[in-house]
Amino acid sequence: MTRARSYEIRTFGCQMNVHDSERLSGLLEDAGYVKAAPGATADLVVFNTCAVRENADNKLYGTLGHLAPVKAGRPGMQIAVGGCLAQKDRDTVVRKAPWVDVVFGTHNIGSLPVLLERARHNEQAQVEILESLEAFPSTLPAKRESAYAGWVSISVGCNNTCTFCIVPALRGKEVDRRPGDVLAEVQALVDQGVLEVTLLGQNVNSYGASFADPDEPRDRGAFAKLLRACGGIEGLERVRFTSPHPAEFTDDVIEAMAQTPNICPQLHMPLQSGSDRVLKAMRRSYRKARYLGIIEKVRAAMPHAAITTDIIVGFPGETEEDFQETLDVVRQARFTSAFTFQYSKRPGTPAAEMADQVPKQVVQERYDRLIALQEEISLAANRELIGTEVELLVAEGSGKKNAATARMSGRARDGRLVHFRPGGTAEPIRPGDLVTVDITEAAPHHLIADAPVKTHRRTRAGDAHERGITPKTAPIGVGLGLPRIGAPAPEPVAAGCSTGCGA
């Protein structure tokens, strides 16, 4: 008796990595693997890594160290390491963790099944890192994690040279997908019940400048056109995108957002610093006046838009005066929320070698002040919503609750997180359904709706979630000669264990 080999993917980092992991799942399941049950020891563990934070390598190698004795006691188990840290460290991974079987990079995720088979056959670690993109992620199958929301990549890579960021070195120059391929993937998700799609790119509003297809003409207005085209897809209720770059944010995108009903009134646009001097040192090709001007235009077109941002505190050379300028911009911008980061050196970036690194205790003190200011602003903005009605796409997982409330959670169209009490409906509310609720309480990072649910719309996404079904998208677009293999050799099942449980 034999059983299929099981797999587990552990993902670190950004939305790009989350989406890449969906592609890895699709590849592995097409090759005959099955997802390991929660808590079970998988035959294959894949790490999709991040290299952005300073301690990313410590986190990876610590986790690999914990797996070494597990693998030693489980014949046939394999470990693969991919993603940005693998692209950066290459042979270092196998040198530090010789029990790793496969190392692959950001440009060749489609080769993983082949590399796993080669490692099994040769009984030797396989390290394959390519310097340029082998295939768009869209040319690979994907096993989606959600029945109601999906990621769609519109580009890969980045042409910017921010001094704190290592991503362009690891993911390469920007390459854009054809609009028809993007829309075909969106349609494929909607056909399977997905209600919300997030368009992904390192810099989405430069889309159209670097099409991979030489027959596709360069088009600086392509992103606005893509947003409007998404508006024509029947059944697609919400469209989000991340992340735009302020230097290339154009009026036609604002107009498309305001005039296309299913584009969500939400904008996440990284600020990084409110000091023009620091922005110049970061090689961010905009200044605070331009940034605030974009926000002013967005709010004029969409008065209730939620605007969020990223801010780095303690960049090398940042003075107290520079930091005060950041606080001033935060006060003027009135962000709904902000992802704030204490600067940490990224090996391989120009900023890591800069003089005037800010002492840790100074960075921490500034960070605390920024957090306090932003929480004050967020709470004030959220309190203004008390008594208003919002539509929620119900999310998986329980909400902020106790035994009395039994709350569920959902996202409003503007992206705010709302915890609501689900009672009072004729049928049970499920993740993927849509409800309308009245806001009764506010906190800096979420809203509460404890009044009875006003409306409840059951959806195909809710049906799929209830049945435990998530979408699977087939390859879309032109492939680049990826090798294909069959299913891996099945594993013998241990006597008395019909489920393939781990030792």
Swiss-Prot record:
What does the UniProt cofactor note say? Binds 2 [4Fe-4S] clusters. One cluster is coordinated with 3 cysteines and an exchangeable S-adenosyl-L-methionine.
List, separated by semicolons, the cofactors it needs.
Answer: [4Fe-4S] cluster
User: Which reaction is the catalytic activity of this chain?
Assistant: N(6)-dimethylallyladenosine(37) in tRNA + (sulfur carrier)-SH + AH2 + 2 S-adenosyl-L-methionine = 2-methylsulfanyl-N(6)-dimethylallyladenosine(37) in tRNA + (sulfur carrier)-H + 5'-deoxyadenosine + L-methionine + A + S-adenosyl-L-homocysteine + 2 H(+)
Task: Say which domain of life the source belongs to.
Answer: Bacteria
Q: Cite the InterPro entries for this sequence.
A: Elp3/MiaA/NifB-like_rSAM, Methylthiotransferase, Methylthiotransferase_CS, Methylthiotransferase_N, Methylthiotransferase_N_sf, MiaB_methiolase, rSAM, rSAM_horseshoe
Which protein family is it in? Answer: Belongs to the methylthiotransferase family. MiaB subfamily.
Report what the protein is called: tRNA-2-methylthio-N(6)-dimethylallyladenosine synthase
Q: Can you name the source organism?
A: Nocardia farcinica (strain IFM 10152)
